[in-house]
Amino acid sequence: MRSYLDFEKPVAELEAKLEELRALGARDGAVAIAEDVARLESKAAAALAELYAALTPWQKTQVARHPQRPHFVDYCDALISEFTPLAGDRSFGEDEAIVGGFGRFRGRPVCVIGQEKGASTEARIRHNFGMARPEGYRKAVRLMDLAGRFGLPVLTFVDTAGAYPGIDAEERGQAEAIARSTEACLALGTPNLALVIGEGGSGGAIALATANRVLMLEHAIYSVISPEGAASILWRDAGRAQDAATAMKITAQDLLRLGVIDAIVPEPTGGAHRDPAAAFRAAEEAIAEGLAGLDGLDAEALRDQRAQKFLEIGRKL
């Protein structure tokens, strides 16, 4: 069953009427409603396209958090063959908020790492809603070290509200783990490419997104803090999250203009959750193009390009 966001109410009403018409036609085939169905389909599609062509930053935030939006494991299943996951950081334990391993992208061996939020209640609890603890980031470092040793490109998929802020995570060195993961990204002698597929929240995101190429899905967001968190700090009112979302420039379109990301990956009309297969195809093409542009660079050039990219962001912003 499709889940609608609050601003999608006009589209929801049209599609509900459309389903009623289809059900009527299924019950009584003699009823000539084909033209009515076609007309309503066209009207609903036009309304959806018009709505999504002018989303506000806050509406994009809602789309990025949509409960039916494809998660990392969905992209991994669609894009990576022969995927073999690795577990544990070889220091403390396993953290399922970050899933990673090795597989093939279009037949090419790669290392794949992603933040997984989980689709069901049970999965969300198991994956801690995509909020990684230190062992998750240390597992990512372990995987990147292996990728560097074997000369494999690293693909990272970012989808997190932020690193887990619990006391246990702080006691085990959360800040240090995030810093080490960021350092490992910068030190890689092989190409790395990051794709923000949903939320890119704070240090929890940058720990996997310090890459040669940083891509974002059209309706993803990427920021130093959530809109609610920013509103609470700036105005002492989380209810002003919409104002914060606009002020922080968190959308893919704003971040491309500012030079923080390298490219925007288009989503199907209505968001990736409406047509996951189309979203996977667009992501595949963007990743393939990004890797092709890095293939001619040696280890030193890759590190230098990566470092200069982020130094330039610091100078400009």
Swiss-Prot record:
<keyword id="KW-0067">ATP-binding</keyword>
<feature type="domain" description="CoA carboxyltransferase C-terminal">
    <location>
        <begin position="39"/>
        <end position="293"/>
    </location>
</feature>
<dbReference type="GO" id="GO:0009317">
    <property type="term" value="C:acetyl-CoA carboxylase complex"/>
</dbReference>
<comment type="function">
    <text>Component of the acetyl coenzyme A carboxylase (ACC) complex. First, biotin carboxylase catalyzes the carboxylation of biotin on its carrier protein (BCCP) and then the CO(2) group is transferred by the carboxyltransferase to acetyl-CoA to form malonyl-CoA.</text>
</comment>
<dbReference type="GO" id="GO:0005524">
    <property type="term" value="F:ATP binding"/>
</dbReference>
<dbReference type="GO" id="GO:2001295">
    <property type="term" value="P:malonyl-CoA biosynthetic process"/>
</dbReference>
<comment type="pathway">
    <text>Lipid metabolism; malonyl-CoA biosynthesis; malonyl-CoA from acetyl-CoA: step 1/1.</text>
</comment>
<dbReference type="InterPro" id="IPR029045">
    <property type="entry name" value="ClpP/crotonase-like_dom_sf"/>
</dbReference>
<comment type="similarity">
    <text>Belongs to the AccA family.</text>
</comment>
<keyword id="KW-0276">Fatty acid metabolism</keyword>
<dbReference type="GO" id="GO:0003989">
    <property type="term" value="F:acetyl-CoA carboxylase activity"/>
</dbReference>
<dbReference type="GO" id="GO:0006633">
    <property type="term" value="P:fatty acid biosynthetic process"/>
</dbReference>
<dbReference type="GO" id="GO:0016743">
    <property type="term" value="F:carboxyl- or carbamoyltransferase activity"/>
</dbReference>
<dbReference type="Pfam" id="PF03255">
    <property type="entry name" value="ACCA"/>
</dbReference>
<keyword id="KW-0808">Transferase</keyword>
<keyword id="KW-0275">Fatty acid biosynthesis</keyword>
<keyword id="KW-0444">Lipid biosynthesis</keyword>
<keyword id="KW-0547">Nucleotide-binding</keyword>
<protein>
    <recommendedName>
        <fullName>Acetyl-coenzyme A carboxylase carboxyl transferase subunit alpha</fullName>
        <ecNumber>2.1.3.15</ecNumber>
    </recommendedName>
</protein>
<dbReference type="InterPro" id="IPR001095">
    <property type="entry name" value="Acetyl_CoA_COase_a_su"/>
</dbReference>
<keyword id="KW-0963">Cytoplasm</keyword>
<dbReference type="InterPro" id="IPR011763">
    <property type="entry name" value="COA_CT_C"/>
</dbReference>
<comment type="subunit">
    <text>Acetyl-CoA carboxylase is a heterohexamer composed of biotin carboxyl carrier protein (AccB), biotin carboxylase (AccC) and two subunits each of ACCase subunit alpha (AccA) and ACCase subunit beta (AccD).</text>
</comment>
<keyword id="KW-0443">Lipid metabolism</keyword>
